């Protein structure tokens, strides 16, 4: 019996090693595919080469208030956006809604739900929307308006799965369908997010590696005519806003009554400069929360203003109450966006 049990444990360890190797190999292959876009321009500006920019808008007040240094912290339904491997960090089912008052009267909405199939497996579904009021069309000869209006909007639907391979290592993936509409033009794409979450075993230290919005280039299609009536049938292709994220977090203060979580994250986008995110969250009685975070572009001084980005600092707070039906968590975040003003985010989570 002892020999059989030992063989069983050895076989389980072998399966875990294979799963870990497969997950890391998948992330490595994805990174290699992006190498031509990312590595040669390390630290450079690559603005304007990708579509579906709404996919870069942070979801949920908690993650945003921590400076978006969140891939190694997320453990709720907002993991559907930040890191799908976060879905199995807690044995909780949750419905999550978020609203962002973005710049120029643009509104960003997010709805997500997660459900545990077993203690080690979880699935989730998410819906993202970016919308604004229709705008009047202007031309060189009619600068005050033509009387015709155009609309713009984005929508994304994602399905996620996460599995806890061991007590320390988790892996998750999301498949997302995205559609963007600009007047008579549309762009559609299917993309993938891949994420890992690893507890090091050294206290509360953990790190995460995530690749989001990974997929093929997209090309607009639709009926478009120039001012002289000439139809346009040749459109430029755009890459997806692929983003590689590496995060590390730990709890330097952890007791029965209070907790302090700190996090640092490196973001490596294919359409902008690399940047570092720093964040912190203080929790009292797991009921009241205070959060803060900053973003700095690589090459900028940490404690000085970032001269290359409108994003600066983030602040936020939240509270949690338990009802007969569920536990409700309400969060708020403020993000300073330089000359564009401040952004306000609100989110609610219903945990069952």
Model regions and ranges:
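N-terminal secretory signal peptides that target proteins for export/translocation
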Residues: 1-16
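Short intrinsically disordered, low-complexity coil segments enriched in acidic
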Residues: 1-3, 22, 113
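Bacterial N-terminal signal peptides
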Residues: 19-30
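Sec/Tat signal peptide C-region and signal peptidase I cleavage site
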Residues: 30-36
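Subset of outer-membrane beta-barrel
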Residues: 37-352
């Amino acid at each position: 019996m002892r020999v059989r049990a030992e063989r069983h444990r050895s076989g389980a360890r072998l399966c875990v090693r294979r799963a870990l190797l497969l997950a890391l190999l998948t992330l490595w292959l994805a990174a290699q595919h992006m190498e031509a876009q990312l590595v040669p321009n390390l630290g450079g500006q690559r603005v304007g080469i990708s579509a579906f920019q709404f996919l870069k808008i942070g979801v949920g007040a908690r993650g945003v208030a921590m400076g978006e240094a969140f891939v190694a912290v997320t453990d709720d339904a907002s993991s559907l956006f930040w890191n799908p491997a976060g879905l199995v960090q807690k044995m909780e089912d949750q419905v999550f809604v978020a609203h962002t008052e973005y710049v120029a009267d643009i509104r960003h909405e997010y709805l997500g739900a997660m459900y545990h199939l077993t203690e080690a497996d979880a699935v989730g579904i998410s819906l993202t929307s970016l919308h604004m009021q229709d705008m009047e069309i202007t031309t060189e000869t009619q600068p005050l308006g033509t009387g015709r209006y155009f609309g713009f909007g984005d929508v994304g639907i994602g399905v996620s799965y996460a599995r806890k391979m061991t007590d320390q290592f988790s892996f998750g993936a999301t498949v997302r369908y995205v559609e963007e509409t600009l007047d008579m033009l549309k762009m559609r794409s299917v993309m993938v997010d891949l994420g890992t979450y690893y507890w090091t075993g050294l206290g509360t230290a953990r790190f995460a590696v995530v690749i989001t919005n990974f997929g093929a280039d997209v090309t607009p299609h639709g009926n478009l005519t120039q001012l002289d009536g000439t139809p346009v049938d040749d459109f430029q292709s755009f890459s997806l806003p692929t983003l590689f994220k590496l995060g590390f977090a730990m709890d330097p203060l952890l007791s029965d009554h209070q907790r302090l979580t700190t996090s640092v994250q490196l973001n490596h986008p294919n359409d902008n400069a690399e940047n570092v995110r720093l964040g912190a969250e203080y929790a009292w009685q797991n009921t009241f929360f205070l959060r803060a975070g900053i973003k700095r572009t690589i090459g900028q001084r940490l404690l000085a203003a970032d001269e290359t980005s409108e994003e600066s600092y983030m602040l936020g707070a939240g509270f949690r109450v338990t009802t007969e039906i569920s536990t409700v968590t309400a969060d708020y975040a403020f993000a300073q966006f330089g000359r564009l003003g401040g952004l306000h985010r609100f989110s609610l989570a219903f945990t069952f």
